[in-house]
Amino acid sequence: MAPVPYDRCMRRTIFAEEHDLFRQSVRTFIEREVAPNFERWDHDGIVDRTLFTAAGGAGFLGIEAPEQFGGGGVKDFRYNTIINEEFAYSGFAPSGLGITLHNDVCLPYFLSLTTEDQKQRWLPGICSGELITAIAMTEPGIGSDLASMSTSAIRDGDDYVVNGAKTFITNGINADLVIVAVKTDPKERHKGMSLIVIERGTPGFERGRNLEKVGLHAQDTAELFFTDARVPAANLLGSEGTGFAHLVDNLPQERLSIGVSAVAAARQALRWTLEYTHDRTAFGQPIANFQNSRFVLAEIATEVEIAEVFLDRCIEALNANELTVEEAAMAKWWTTELQKRVVDSCVQLHGGYGYMLEYPIARAYIDARIQTIYGGTTEIMKEIIGRSLRP
């Protein structure tokens, strides 16, 4: 009996029929809106803003937002997962990163911390794609130690006066609304942090260059500068001094989102490599026939299956509001380190062609490297887990 073509070994049980239909819609959207433009975006270092409005029109933005604001009114991270996975499977993941950040990372702040007036001002545009979002935490010289940030927001009448700089900001060029972590009390560390939304066009708010990265070329990543930028006090998210706590509350979903992209990218790398190794011949036979190739592919397939099962359990836990900070950290570090190992092994099996950017595995290789850094480094993830372990 001939072997069955590989897709996955275990049947996934977390999705229902409506999710499968949604997945097909996302796949069609990517084929129509992304595929014809990706090479240009990859060259330019930024996607067109129309990608967001097209996604909004298709119902792929603000899925969790109330219908009255143009959202889907559905709190179900499985839909977010599908968008994330399909961009990874397509090979166009960098063009989808801004959308997953918009949905998975930024939207929760606008849902849980906003007043009714803020919701009316911002949510319709966020759901339609007319208002693109970003979140700015990292500062030059300050990476994982957020409490040491120096960007300040000092109250002055009905405004905050913001001074400082942020760097490595995803959607930094395209963003209309930037959630900025600031110190409203510079004398305090964690308790001095607050979150404030700074809008495009605010006097004193300037964007630096679109940073040239090793990978994720189609995703704009920028420096942001604030020089006596006057921001209405009405743009404060939540209350003063609660910013760090809100960041901690929302980081598990961000880290799970990164884990989803990591496992999907690893699975797609395996698919590309299976196709290549069965087509490419050496010494009179497909290179997939060699024992070393079989062993490497077997290891990859096994680890991807294991990772996906754990990830699916984390998705179920998130939907049930049960996902812990430690579980999210486990998912984030393990899956992203797996992605790095997988794409490296897959490049090796491609040989010299794996180093050519015309092959998708080469792009997957350079895109993977950042995954163990942003959203919390592997080392920080292990520290979070390690601190929680008690006899």
Task: List where the protein language model places each region.
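Alpha-helical interface subdomain recognition
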Residues: A2-G91, T100, L113-Q118, G125-E130, ...
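Helix-loop "lid/cap" segments that line or gate small-molecule binding pockets
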Residues: D104-L113
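Flexible, small-/acidic-enriched active-site or ligand-binding loops
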Residues: S148, G201-P232
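Short glycine/proline-enriched turns and hinge-like loops at secondary-structure junctions
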Residues: V74-K75, D145-A147, N171-A175, R189-G192, ...
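A short core secondary-structure module
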Residues: D158-D159, N163-R207
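A short, charged helix-loop
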Residues: L224-D249
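A short, Trp-centered hydrophobic/proline-enriched beta-strand micro-motif
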Residues: G129-M137, A181
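Short Gly/Pro-enriched turn/cap motifs at secondary-structure boundaries
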Residues: T100, I126, G141-S144, F168-N171, ...
